[in-house]
């Protein structure tokens, strides 16, 4: 059976798990070997705490907006079923893993690391393949000429889609030693529709 790659991103209320910050949006996108999105799990979350104003300026999610969203404990079973046994790729993976482990611990769930096959960090991979230059998701999209026209704010869903393309570009670079051709971020009709609609605190399944 082919290895299943899932591209994950979270948005949070701040930067410190130990300081009480929580996950307020989570997305996991399954993509093929060319980075094209196949299906996705996405939801906003009620973090049950106030939003840091700096974090809000980055992702645009306010405390009041998230009040009607599900709590992590309400979606953890669906989330774990989606990621089970897969290889997870995240940009600065330690950050996302720590926050997700924190949410699972609060909800009495199992370990995230123990629920998946392995966790890969695209930032670390980029550092090994591209020793010079910036390695943020934005910088890598620019370097690989990946279109980001659907990205106005940081958002877990669009960032996960873009990460799939970045990972495919890094793989092509590693295998062939050449830069891949420019691409426009691939979005399924369902994902494109979700991104065009006003942000809504609603559980979204794609595919």
Residue ranges and their predicted role:
Residues 1-117, 127-130, 135-154:
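Conserved non-catalytic scaffold segment of RNase H-like nuclease domains
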Residues 87-90, 94, 99, 103-104, ...:
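Acidic, Mg2+-coordinating catalytic module of metal-dependent nucleases/exonucleases
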Residues 205-207:
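Charged interaction scaffolds used for protein-protein
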């Amino acid at each position: 059976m082919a290895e299943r790659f899932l591209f994950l991103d979270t948005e949070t209320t701040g930067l410190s798990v130990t300081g009480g910050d929580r996950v307020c949006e989570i997305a996991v996108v399954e993509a093929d070997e060319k980075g094209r999105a196949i299906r996705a799990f996405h939801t906003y979350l009620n973090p049950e705490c106030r939003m840091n104003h700096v974090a809000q300026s980055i992702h645009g999610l306010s405390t009041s907006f998230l009040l009607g969203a599900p709590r992590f404990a309400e979606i953890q079973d669906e989330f774990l079923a989606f990621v089970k046994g897969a290889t997870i790729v995240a940009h600065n993976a330690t950050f996302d893993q720590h926050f997700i482990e924190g949410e699972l611990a609060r909800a009495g769930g199992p370990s995230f690391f123990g629920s998946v096959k392995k966790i890969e960090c695209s930032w670390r991979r980029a550092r090994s393949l591209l020793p010079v230059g910036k390695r943020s998701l934005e910088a890598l999209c620019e370097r690989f000429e990946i279109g980001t026209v659907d990205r106005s704010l940081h958002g877990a869903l669009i960032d996960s889609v873009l990460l799939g393309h970045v990972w495919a570009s890094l793989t092509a670079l590693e295998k062939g030693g050449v830069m891949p051709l420019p691409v426009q971020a691939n979005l399924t009709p369902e994902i494109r529709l979700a991104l065009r609609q006003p942000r809504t605190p609603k559980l979204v399944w794609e595919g």
